[in-house]
């Protein structure tokens, strides 16, 4: 079902299911030989959500190669490698920000992100997690049952990013006078183009000089064969449905021309450095992800780290 302005979801449906998929990929990456990342909470969180498809994938009962359409550029088997590199990027961003003295962090659309629990935060750090109420409630309760303890002062902000989240964030104790480290991981593709701009405007308005932002940009779609891309998504959906999971991936994102993230941020006073996923993979010694013209490959995604100088 296509997205609507006021749609809702949990971690087993719609956009929420993609958070579970990403957590499953992190779990597999964590359990790999010589793992690049360590997210010990990913697997138990995926199991708690209870989507059989992802649970079987994490445990090895479902093999990605059996699910993937081998003629497509988008494959489930690429996910653990890609998410390992992506996770490392955002983990390193927070590490660099705290080493620079920042003690306030915000995770936008936090989903099953467990960084507040698994990273080594300096004393005095406050981490804010923002997501829909039922997502926040589920993750917080599940981690409590696991005996997990936040490694920083954790303040959850149960609000939809389409609502007045800046007000809710400030009411939760956010200090606009202090530099902040923000991350928007895996988020922009699920926002309409104008909502992406509005989010960046709000982040800027809330940020003190010296704040930092890490995000990923939707690649240029101009050279993508749209008809082939749509057919690829239909095939992928059909293959997943055969294995018991029905999610129309083509309905989850928003199309339309977007402002270039780096250029837009530069106009707001940020200075950005971008690195493509292909470079993150190479830097980590991970296998490259093949690129095709039937879709935008995850290898095309650009990851930005920005600093605000008002």
Swiss-Prot record:
Lineage top rank: taxon: Bacteria
Family the entry assigns: Belongs to the UPF0677 family.
The organism of origin for this protein: Mycolicibacterium paratuberculosis (strain ATCC BAA-968 / K-10) (Mycobacterium paratuberculosis)
Role of this protein: Exhibits S-adenosyl-L-methionine-dependent methyltransferase activity.
Protein name (database record): Putative S-adenosyl-L-methionine-dependent methyltransferase MAP_2076c
A GO term for molecular function: methyltransferase activity
InterPro entries according to UniProt: Ppm1/Ppm2/Tcmp, SAM-dependent_MTases_sf, SAM_mthyl_Trfase_ML2640-like
Keywords assigned: Methyltransferase, S-adenosyl-L-methionine, Transferase
SUPFAM superfamilies reported in the protein's UniProt record: S-adenosyl-L-methionine-dependent methyltransferases
Presence of the UniProt keyword Phosphoprotein in the record: no
Lineage: Bacteria, Bacillati, Actinomycetota, Actinomycetes, Mycobacteriales
EC number(s) on file: 2.1.1.-
Annotated binding of S-adenosyl-L-methionine, by residue: 131, 160-161
Keyword Metal-binding: no
Biological process, per Gene Ontology: methylation
Enzyme class: transferase
């Amino acid at each position: 079902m296509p997205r609507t302005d006021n749609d809702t979801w949990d971690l087993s449906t719609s956009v929420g299911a993609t958070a579970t998929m990403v957590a499953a990929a992190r779990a597999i990456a964590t359990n790999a030989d010589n793992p690049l990342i360590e997210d010990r909470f990913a697997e138990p969180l995926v199991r708690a959500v209870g989507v059989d498809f992802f649970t079987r994938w994490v445990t090895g009962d479902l093999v990605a190669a059996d699910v993937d359409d081998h003629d497509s550029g988008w494959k489930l088997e690429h996910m653990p490698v890609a998410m390992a590199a992506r996770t490392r990027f955002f983990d390193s961003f927070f590490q660099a920000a705290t080493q620079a003295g920042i003690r306030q962090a915000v995770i936008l659309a936090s989903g099953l992100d467990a960084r507040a629990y698994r990273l080594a935060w300096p004393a005095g750090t406050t981490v804010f997690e923002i997501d829909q109420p039922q997502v926040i409630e589920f993750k917080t309760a599940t981690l409590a049952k696991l005996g997990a303890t936040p490694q920083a002062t954790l303040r959850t902000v149960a609000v939809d990013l389409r609502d007045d989240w800046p007000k809710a964030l400030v009411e939760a104790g956010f200090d606009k006078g202090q530099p902040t480290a923000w991350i928007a991981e895996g988020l922009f593709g699920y926002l309409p183009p104008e909502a992406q701009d509005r989010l960046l405007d709000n982040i800027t308005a809330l940020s003190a000089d010296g704040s930092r932002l890490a995000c990923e940009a939707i690649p240029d779609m101009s050279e993508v064969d749209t008809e082939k891309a749509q057919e690829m998504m239909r095939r992928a959906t059909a293959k997943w449905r055969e294995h018991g999971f029905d999610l129309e991936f083509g309905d989850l994102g928003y199309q339309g021309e977007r402002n270039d993230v780096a250029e837009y941020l530069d106009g707001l006073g940020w200075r950005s450095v971008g690195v493509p996923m292909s470079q993150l993979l190479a830097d980590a010694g991970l296998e490259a992800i093949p690129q095709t013209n039937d879709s935008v490959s995850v290898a095309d995604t650009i990851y930005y780290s920005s600093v605000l100088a008002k």
